[in-house]
């Protein structure tokens, strides 16, 4: 009994290691969650959108209606926001400034989420914002659907994700301007 007491930690550790080694589903779960086994195909799929992700009808709030697929083959600044979202509202002046300086190089698509048309139009008019704003009229794919607001993607001509930002950012900063310049050449 004294052997067991002295070595209890080692015995428990041995049992845990044996369980992981012998129970295949548990081993696969741990490997999937913590393992570094990404394949090139998986990395590419996770760092780019597919054609079906762009199959979204958009109702224009301050521009004509469009389809997200209209922007394939171009550099796209895609922002998900809401008038109800304080960080989104904080970010807007920098997005508007970026839009005014870079709209010849990049297509801007700002999608208001969980919002009413009247609230979006009022927000744009009160602040004199001109960046193109839409409300999605068809469901977004799980890959495109944001987890937090604001979420912004800069998407390349081949639907690759060049940048993803899950928080407020000063889009008019020198770094952001330089990034947009570098990807839009």
Description of each model-found segment:
Residues 89-127, 135-143, 178:
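Structural microenvironment flanking redox-active thiols in thiol-disulfide oxidoreductases
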Residues 122-129, 135-183:
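Thiol/disulfide oxidoreductase modules built on the thioredoxin-like
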Residues 72, 80-97:
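Conserved redox-active cysteine motifs that mediate thiol-disulfide chemistry
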Residues 50, 55-76:
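A short beta-strand-turn-helix
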Residues 77-81, 112:
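Structural cue for short, hydrophobic secondary-structure segments
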Residues 72-74, 104, 129-130, 146-147:
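Active-site acidic short loop of glycosyltransferases
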Residues 1-53:
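N-terminal targeting signals for export/organelle localization
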């Amino acid at each position: 009994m004294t052997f067991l007491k002295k070595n209890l930690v080692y015995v428990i550790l041995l049992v845990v290691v044996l369980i992981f080694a012998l129970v295949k589903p548990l081993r696969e779960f741990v490997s999937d969650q913590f393992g570094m086994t990404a394949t090139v195909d998986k990395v590419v799929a996770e760092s780019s959108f597919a054609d079906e992700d762009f199959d979204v009808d958009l109702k224009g709030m301050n521009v004509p209606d469009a389809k997200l697929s209209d922007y394939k083959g171009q550099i796209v600044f895609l922002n998900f926001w809401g008038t109800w979202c304080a960080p989104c509202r904080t970010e807007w002046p920098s997005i508007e400034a970026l839009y005014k300086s870079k709209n010849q190089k990049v297509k801007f698509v700002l999608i208001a989420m969980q919002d009413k048309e009247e609230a979006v139009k009022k927000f744009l008019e009160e602040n004199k914002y001109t960046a193109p704003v839409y409300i999605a009229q068809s469901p977004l794919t799980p890959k495109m659907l944001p987890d937090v607001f604001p979420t912004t993607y800069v998407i390349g001509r081949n639907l690759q994700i060049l940048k993803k930002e899950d928080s407020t950012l000063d889009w008019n900063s020198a770094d952001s301007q330089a990034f947009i310049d570098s990807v839009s050449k």
